[in-house]
Regions:
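A conserved, positively charged/aromatic
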Residues: 2, 77, 127-153
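Carbohydrate-associated surface elements
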Residues: 14, 161, 184
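A conserved catalytic-core segment of Leloir-type glycosyltransferases
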Residues: 15-82
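Short N-terminal targeting/anchoring amphipathic segment
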Residues: 35, 79-81, 92-111
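Acidic anion/phosphate-binding donor-loop and adjacent secondary structure
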Residues: 139-140, 167, 182-199
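Short alpha-helical donor nucleotide-sugar binding micro-motif in glycosyltransferases
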Residues: 149, 262-263, 269-274
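Conserved donor-binding/catalytic core segment of Leloir-type glycosyltransferases
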Residues: 194-222, 233
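Nucleotide-activated donor-binding/catalytic signature segment of Leloir-type glycosyltransferases, i.e.
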Residues: 233-236, 242-263, 275
Length: 275
């Protein structure tokens, strides 16, 4: 989006610990991101943000509060959470208004999207969101997914399966607004020699159970039976790393599987380390 000349103002609900930001690019992103929760913890800023929203339009402020209540799942706890989302939405909307933002896009359809849909209402701008799944499809009512789809200007699904699930939980009138944008890479940056016969495999991503690295390790054990000189390099880190390392050792293939950890120059490394 930035490459096309559009000004992008990054925002995040939570501020992760500084130690979690690896590499120059992530540290730069941290510095330019507006964090909603830390700002909302300042009572004066919170009151000022909602005060300005109230003065701009009492009707819209009250309508958005009613929407927050309506989008709750059953139970008192859920209502309390929705009120927190409304408070955070006021702070985010104030930031968007001061920066003259014309469209709000949110990543994922769960709690952060609950804040986004309310902030968009307060700021009187359209919003959209990207959904990966699959976890949210098990908690559709909790996250008011049909309401969010109905109110969104468009919804991005990362796969045909994801789009089908979004269609399942939305009114057919809104199906046309659900589009597919795959999580891909720039093909020109990752060209390889199609005539090569290398046996080096690379995985790049967060080591989390949903990413499927464990399946790749299982498959590698089968590959090594026919190609004992094959290797697998996993670039990335995460909660599933210890289990993946243990599984590689249990399969007896730990010498063929390398865990590279977090990397910043993945492309340069894998141009010489994979096929």
């Amino acid at each position: 989006v930035r490459a096309s000349g559009v000004r992008v103002i990054p925002c995040s609900i939570r501020q992760p610990p500084e130690a979690e930001f690896k590499g120059q690019e992530e540290r730069r992103a941290r510095a330019e991101t507006f964090y909603v929760k830390p700002a909302a913890r300042n009572p004066l800023r919170l009151l000022a943000a909602h005060g300005r929203a109230f003065l701009r339009s009492t009707a819209i402020w009250a309508k958005t509060l009613a929407l927050a209540v309506r989008m709750r799942s059953p139970g008192v706890k859920a209502l309390i959470w929705q009120l927190f989302y409304f408070l955070e939405a006021g702070v985010l909307a104030d930031h968007l208004h001061r920066n003259r933002v014309r469209h709000l896009h949110n990543h994922f359809g769960n709690s952060s999207c609950s804040v986004a849909v309310l902030a968009a209402e307060l700021a009187r701008i359209p919003f959209s969101f990207t959904e990966h799944g699959p976890a949210i499809f098990f908690e559709v009512d909790r996250w008011a997914l049909p309401e969010k789809i109905a109110r969104a200007a468009f919804v991005v699904a990362i796969t045909h399966f994801c789009r089908s699930q979004l269609m399942l939980f939305s009114d057919p009138r809104h199906w046309d607004k659900i589009t597919i944008v795959h999580c891909g890479v720039d093909p020109a940056a990752y060209r390889r020699d199609p005539g090569g016969n290398g046996k080096r495999v690379a995985f790049v991503g967060r080591l989390d159970p949903v990413k499927g690295a464990l399946l790749l390790i299982e498959a590698m054990a089968t590959v090594l039976k026919a190609h004992p000189d094959a290797t697998l390099t996993l670039a990335g880190d995460g909660p599933a790393r210890a289990g993946a390392e243990a599984r590689a050792k249990a399969l007896g293939i730990e010498t063929a599987v390398r865990f590279a950890g977090f990397m910043t120059q993945v492309l340069e490394q894998f141009r010489t380390d994979s096929d």
